[in-house]
Amino acid sequence: MNDLIILNKPYGVICQFSAHEKHQCLKDFVEKPGFYPAGRLDTDSEGLLLLTNNGRLQAQIADPKFKQVKTYWAQVEGSPDEVKLDLLRRGVDLGDFVTRPAEVRVLEEGEADVLWPRVPPIRVRKSVPDFWVEIKISEGKNRQVRRMTAKAGFPCLRLVRVAIGRLNLFDLNLELGQWQFAPHRP
């Protein structure tokens, strides 16, 4: 399958191919003419990013009407609280829209150790606990996961997209900044 690329996007990379004065861009990692992101990841988010040269496929991946499930691991401030986590599970009113219900689970201690170290490292406050949560959503509006966790009382420290549909970053063994053609559709 040579119309779909999977990139393990590093922190600080902007999701465009044109050069940017402050950030690295996709062209610094993928030099394949005609490929464009199927959805985006914020500059301060990391992980699985799909690129394609197929417009129909791009729409199937990025358009919320197709309900493609995207899985994120978020390191958040606070301690697990089921009442707050249930807010994410029911859907969150963010003011400009209400999110669809999300699947949410707290990661086991050490489960996020499979992730690479972030450069630069996140700020650590010894007096404020943090934990990792997995959030699965079928939409992907601007900064949605960060806004959802903040609204639930868990400010987001680090956000990594680990899967889109059946494409899982850990199954692919992609190092940070590496890419490969997708073995199958999401």
Name each model-derived stretch:
Residues 1-186:
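RNA pseudouridine synthases
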